[in-house]
Design a protein with these regions (language model features):
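Terminal low-complexity/charged segments
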Residues: 1-208, 285, 367-378, 443, ...
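Active-site bordering "gate/hinge" segments
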Residues: 128, 161-195, 203-548
């Protein structure tokens, strides 16, 4: 990274560097940030924005931007802050990385930081009449300020931008989300095909979709806010309550981040068990995705078939973890208990049964003339768009984007197994559907290799020795893994509090589904309103993972 640091120093002489951590940290003043960001993307190839993390450092408010060069897989992070707590403002980078649009709105919602030149400076999760910004350290949580309201939000069509002219003057410009002549319909929040409480305000021209405004936050539970008053062990529980079809993966990611901060070496057997549980959960998730997508298109029979195989996986979870979905199995240093003696045999049996039924899934639906007509060529997301909107996982790979974290930044024991990264190139609903079925074959391939490794595993150490009271040193860490729907990222910051029951200073989850809904408008535009449901189903988002 030394050459990158030199180039950044040339581009921005005011930049400060810290290379002592895992990733190069670049601190820049806000007035230089946009120019540097443009150079980082266009000259240095940092074309992928992993996360925008808002942080209140008490003496300042700001963001940590995590960036990746998708060609070299180099990563760095940039810190930009302001000391103005009354009217905190930073310059937007949503014109450079489209994913920053929703992420900066989230930062504004929770920290009150306005982004100059952002096209739509509305809150994202909380009501428009919410008082205060909950993740600020000076937030007043008095329930009288924000009572439970049973009325609709006022002025939901109003938004604004802070526009900066060539002289640096910033003017607030009031705007409307939809024009007066647009015909807008509501899809959700209580609609079966939104797969939860999510709302699409949709502008249509005849049968064609012209614009989709995503309205989320109906089940926002404030997981990141609650984490500020929990110990690290207690935070593990809430990590499973986001994407319930990737519960083990989310918990695995948080454990890895804490273990990285403490320098804990996890026993080989424990990592092997973790990886097997991850892949079993990936299989279960892709089976559910198949069932839901077929149901959304009226194929009721096909919907029920994958539930038969999912029961095999849930039986394994229940027998070895004591629960079927939110297993609370990973812990800091390993797993909470060893697997049962017949675990490997059960996994092998499940792999054999699921593999035998994959051709049946294709026979039921993949060649159906109605399915082909509704999915082929609809909801197209190009590779460039996938990178720009930071859409990874199966959706990104269906657009030709090589983005599997298990390959690009191997964690756990993925560098010890042989598997293929499944990549398609059309980027339409059909490729997204087909890719998940193909990925199931690779998960089975990984699981069989893991079973062979378990047979040869010596000893039964399933957890490292860790302190009873977890205390992290002062610093910040970022960890990502490949979850069912894309990369889940965990940002963790500690202030080094010496108190016995130390709590995270800042814990942020960069959920894959939050990025997926960022392309709903893009993929649905100029498609038939009837196909909107199919397109969004092929994105395979989970509402609690969006809302957190």
């Amino acid at each position: 990274m030394a050459d990158i640091q030199e180039k950044i120093a040339e581009l921005c002489p005011d930049a400060q560097f810290d290379a002592t951590g895992e990733l190069l940290l670049v601190t820049v003043p806000d007035e230089k940030w946009h120019d540097l960001a443009k150079a980082l993307k266009e000259q240095l190839g940092f074309d992928y924005l992993n996360a925008v993390v808002g942080v209140d450092w008490k003496d300042s408010l700001g963001c940590m931007y995590y960036l990746t060069n998708t060609e070299t897989q180099d990563m760095l992070h940039v810190k930009v802050a302001t000391t103005d707590r009354e009217k905190p403002r930073l310059h937007t980078v949503s014109d450079l990385w489209a994913v920053a649009n929703f992420q900066e709105r989230e930062v504004y919602d929770f920290f009150g930081i306005e982004f100059i030149n952002h096209p739509d400076m509305r809150r994202f999760f909380l009501r428009t009449d919410w008082v205060g910004h909950p993740l600020r350290k000076d937030y007043d949580a008095d329930e009288k300020l924000n009572p439970i309201r049973l009325s609709s939000e006022p002025n939901e069509d109003d938004t604004y931008s802070l526009v900066e002219d060539a002289q640096g003057n910033v003017t607030r410009v009031e705007k409307k989300v939809f024009g007066a002549d647009e015909y807008v319909i509501n899809i959700g929040p209580q609609h079966p095909s939104t797969h939860g409480v999510l709302r699409y305000r949709t502008s249509i021209d005849g049968e064609l979709v012209k614009k989709v405004d995503v309205v989320s936050g109906y089940i926002h539970r404030g997981i990141e806010k609650m984490s500020e008053s929990l110990t690290y062990q207690q935070c593990l529980l809430y990590s499973e309550r986001m994407d319930y079809m990737a519960a083990h993966m989310n918990r695995h990611c948080l454990c890895l981040c804490i273990e990285k901060a403490l320098g804990i070496e996890v026993p080989h057997r424990a990592e092997l068990i973790r990886m097997m549980m991850d892949e079993l959960m990936r299989l279960s998730s892709h089976l559910l995705s198949y069932g839901c997508l077929t149901m959304d298109q009226g194929a009721t029979t096909a919907f029920f078939y994958p539930f038969r195989e999912r029961e095999l996986i849930y039986d394994i979870f229940d027998k070895n973890c004591g629960a079927r979905m939110s297993m609370s199995y990973d812990t800091i240093g390993g797993v909470t208990m060893d697997v049962q003696p017949d675990f490997v045999a059960d996994v092998r049996h499940a792999c054999d049964v699921i593999e035998a039924h994959i051709p049946e899934y294709h026979k039921l639906f993949s060649g159906n003339v109605i399915a082909l007509g509704r999915m082929k060529g609809t909801g197209v997301l190009t590779k460039e768009q996938a990178v720009n909107y930071a859409v990874g996982g199966p959706t990104g790979r269906a657009s030709g984007f090589h983005c599997d974290v298990r390959k690009t930044h191997p964690y756990s024991l993925y560098n010890e197994v042989d598997f293929d990264e499944v990549v398609y190139n059309n980027g339409d609903s059909y490729d997204r559907y087909m890719l998940r079925l193909k990925e199931m074959e690779q998960s089975i391939k990984i699981l069989r290799q893991c079973c062979d490794m378990m047979d040869k595993e010596e000893g039964n150490e399933y957890c490292a020795k860790v302190p009873k009271l977890i205390k992290l040193p002062k610093g910040h860490w970022y960890q990502q893994i490949e979850a069912s729907r894309g990369p889940i990222g965990v940002y963790l910051e500690s202030d080094g509090d010496p108190k016995p029951f130390q709590k995270p200073y800042r814990l942020h989850y960069q959920s894959p589904c939050f990025n997926l809904i960022g392309v709903v408008d893009l993929t649905c535009k100029d498609n038939l309103i009837a196909d909107l449901i199919t397109i969004t189903a092929s994105l395979d988002y989970v509402i609690p993972d969006i809302d957190r």
